[in-house]
Amino acid sequence: MSLLKKTVYLIIFSCLGCQIHAQKSELTSQLVSQYEQYKEPSLNMRRIKHEDITPLIKTLKNKPGVAIRQVGSSIDGRSLNLLSLGTGKTSIFLWSQMHGDESTATQAIFDILRFFTSPTANPTRDLLLKKLNLHFLPMLNPDGAALFTRRNTLGIDINRDALDLASPEGQTLKRVRDSLSANFGFNLHDQSRYYNTERTAKPATISYLAPAYNYEKDINEVRGNAMRVIVFMNELVQDFAPGQVGRYNDDFEPRAFGDNIQKWGTSAILIESGGYQNDIEKQEIRKLNYVSILAALHSIATESYKKISIDAYEKIPQNDRKLFDLKLEDVSYNLLGKMYTLDLGINHLEVENASHSAFYTKAQLVDIGDLSTYYGYETMNGAGYTVVPGKIYTPKPQEIPTYKNSIALLKKGYVYWKGRITMPEKGLNFPMQAVSDNFKLPDFRFYIGLNPSFLLSKDGVITHAVINGYLINLFKETSTFRNAIFLR
């Protein structure tokens, strides 16, 4: 090929790439700016249940162009519903929450359905409905959702039931997939908020995977198309969460639905919703699901994904799991009269109420030592700071704990508030650990599993407190503190 021809081809592909990028930017700007008008207001937390989405499905029955049919039932008898719309030739199947405690995409699905059923004029919506035949199966595991737990009532992981089909939920997913023979499938999950993008301190807010369909991890047209759409979504999400997209491990799992759906001929795309700074209920990540899924549908409807090279798929950084909620670096710690310098990794575990509708956090010390290859949502350089065990404060009669007086007590070395206090289901709203009248402080030492509550001093002055795993600067008003707990 002559130099002139090569130059011409480069110019053509460069212009084509610029055109695609410009179209994508315009589309995403539109989707983001309009999101709030389509967001389903009744869903605003992770712990949603079948009874929360049932009235939304009933409302959608009255919308023109929407077909709803019950395609199965869970073990406990909750309905599994398929919502279909669009008249196009390209069939797309989206399902969510096969793990009951992974609800971010379920919320996004109802945002997307509001987008599609809105009466206001929208050229993007019209194009998608004309080109695509869309099928949504939200909350595949409603029994697990009722308890906010991963597995179903049978106690199995539905995502490891693609071969045995022991569960009615797994049977339903297989039957629907086969009846649709969908061109594309979106397998929508949540992952731990402690995943980061490899070798960075950034959380893997969204992770993608085009699952392998064999141990060799071969790439055929079906899997290649899934990779192309993922590359498109990755470039889009980078605009809103730069460096916070990961690539899920693609080792073949012969029992998993995603891997088998890829094998059965549907281009399977796994989307995992991870963590995002100060977004415990994952509402920002929900928005990213909404935008990226609709943009992906647009790329399929216009077939623009076909112009994307799969080489960029491998360039998406892999997931790693090296995040803590709080990382303290190089703090000085006195043990048996000898000073040690070490790092601390602390995570916040969620403790649910009886109805699995609310929670408080109970922190745990999960790692100690050299944590230089780990990161934190919040990190403090503790060089020069010394760990100070806290004292118990006995309040005066009628004295009530508040945030303000707790800060004053922390500065004096008190960490524990003695007295009868009823703990709300979302925990105590003042930054001291409550203890009973007969509570005895054990000898202070760090160990894995400890609920970390202590003070930090510098040059003899107490400057910071760690209460139930939350770091509090005692001389600043801002803090990530969420709740303390009652220690018995």
Segments (PLM) and residue ranges:
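Bacterial Sec-dependent N-terminal signal peptides
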Residues: 1-26
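Short beta-strand/turn micro-motifs at beta-sheet edges
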Residues: 77, 123, 257-260
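C-terminal accessory segments enriched in acidic
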Residues: 3, 22-47, 180, 209-218, ...
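Acidic/His- and Gly-rich active-site-bordering loop/insert found
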Residues: 75-100
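Short glycine- and acidic-rich boundary segments immediately preceding or forming the N-terminal edge
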Residues: 24-79
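Active-site/substrate-binding loop(s) of hydrolase catalytic cores
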Residues: 89-91, 98, 103-243, 262
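Surface-exposed patches in mature extracellular/periplasmic domains of secreted proteins
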Residues: 68-72, 121-126, 244-250
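Active-site-proximal beta-strand/loop segments in catalytic clefts of secreted hydrolases
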Residues: 71-73, 85, 96, 137-141, ...
